[in-house]
Regions:
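A charged, aromatic-enriched C-terminal amphipathic alpha-helix characteristic of glycosyltransferases
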Residues: 88, 104-140
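Conserved active-site histidine-acidic residue motif and adjacent donor-binding/catalytic loop
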Residues: 11-14, 20-36, 88
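Glycosyltransferase donor-sugar binding loop
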Residues: 1-17
Length: 143
């Protein structure tokens, strides 16, 4: 919470979290739709989510994402709007802050590129490109 340019929105179940610093509260869907694109990126430094849906939502809104290694499953780490913080660096506030700033600088200028990338996570594409081929392979192997 010591990064001044970082704002927090969402559920807060941790009593150690200081809600007096940059905490925006839990947003309703209406607030989310209205405000999300006012930000440059989403930062999720979590060790409990492998494929966080909030990242897909952020990408579809044109926001870059900054995640830990744990939250990077299925993300293309070669994209400049996807920043992966190594576990060994999560506690290095200066490093994390610099990565957030670099990601934000790129992301605000490349929203359309980010939105295009996010389309691969659309359910229509996931079903067509992932699920149907898997089912077809299972069916063909069982013959």
């Amino acid at each position: 919470q010591s990064i001044q340019s970082l704002y927090y929105a969402g559920n807060n179940a941790d009593p150690r979290f200081d809600i007096s610093k940059n905490y925006l509260g839990e947003w309703s869907k209406q607030q989310l739709y209205k405000n999300l694109t006012e930000y440059g990126n989403l930062v999720l430094l979590s060790d409990g989510e492998a494929h966080p849906l909030v990242c897909m939502e952020a990408l579809s809104a044109g926001l870059g994402v900054v995640v830990t290694e744990w939250g990077a499953a299925n993300l293309d780490s070669t994209k400049d709007f996807i920043t992966i913080i190594p576990e060994s660096k999560v506690s290095d506030i200066a490093y994390v802050q610099s990565q957030i700033i670099n990601n934000r600088s790129y992301s605000v200028e490349h929203r359309q590129e980010i939105i295009e990338y996010s389309k691969q996570f659309d359910w229509v594409n996931v079903i067509k490109d992932v699920y149907i081929p898997i089912v077809e392979k299972i069916v063909s192997e069982s013959k």
